[in-house]
Swiss-Prot record:
GO BP of this protein: AMP salvage
GO cellular component, one term: cytoplasm
Keywords, in A-Z order: ATP-binding, Cytoplasm, Kinase, Metal-binding, Nucleotide biosynthesis, Nucleotide-binding, Transferase, Zinc
Name listed for the protein in its UniProt record: Adenylate kinase
Domain of life: Bacteria
Gene: adk
């Protein structure tokens, strides 16, 4: 079972990835993890990627593609894998098709956890911090027990980090939506896309994903 897991920041992709690998015996291949592993193990592509990362530059597609290809060549992917964070654009999607075709494999499903942008802004911009002790809260998921009073130190002054402010979150989401939309269209045309409603509770989202994956087996 060869999968790609997609979803905008705040859609709950990390939580669902964890649930999938707990219940299906396939490796979770996150691009962040494989970059770190490739650099640590000094693979040819890891050495190449490190040059860009050390300079604070974006890693070119061909290097990212090479690192994914190295990882997909490992034995534990023989019976399937779940890619998370790749592909990020249409060039990478085409490269993935090519590398799978070379080893007589194909994608079985692309799971896209869909959450409306305004809900994502609310989820991602709800965090606030006690100015006195640094305790972190979220207005939806982890509000103080007494409104306006820190549970930890009893102070009443809170602030929000700049990157948690709604306008910053919205800008970050806009960038991701621009990358995501062509990929959703691409996989829809290929007939492998499964849209999952990510606005349900966590267990219900997983139930819907599980139904898709069970039908693939």
């Amino acid at each position: 079972m060869n999968l790609v897991l997609m979803g905008l920041p705040g859609a709950g992709k990390g939580t669902q990835a964890q649930k999938i690998v707990e219940n299906f015996p396939i490796p979770h291949i996150s691009t962040g993890d494989i970059f770190r592993a490739a650099m640590k193990n000094e693979t040819p592509m890891g050495i190449e990627a490190k040059k860009y990362i050390d300079k604070g530059e974006l890693v070119p597609d061909e290097v990212t593609n090479g690192i994914v290809k190295e990882r997909l060549a490992q034995d534990d992917t023989k019976d399937g894998f779940m890619l998370d964070g790749f592909p990020r654009n249409l060039n990478q999607a085409a490269a993935l098709d090519e590398m799978l075709a070379e080893s007589n494999r194909h994608l079985d499903a692309v799971i896209n956890i869909h959450v409306e942008p305004d809900v994502l802004v609310e989820r991602l911009s709800g965090r606030f911090i006690c100015r006195n002790c640094g305790a972190t809260y979220h207005k939806l998921y982890n509000a103080p027990k007494v409104e306006g009073t820190c549970d930890v130190c009893g102070h009443h002054e809170f602030y929000q980090r700049d990157d948690d402010k709604p306008e910053t979150v919205k800008n970050r989401l806009d960038v991701n939506i621009k990358l995501n939309t062509p990929l959703v269209d691409y996989y829809q045309k290929k007939g492998v896309l499964h849209e999952i409603n990510g606005e349900q509770d966590i267990d219900k989202v997983y139930e819907d994903i599980k139904k898709v994956l069970t039908n693939l087996n």
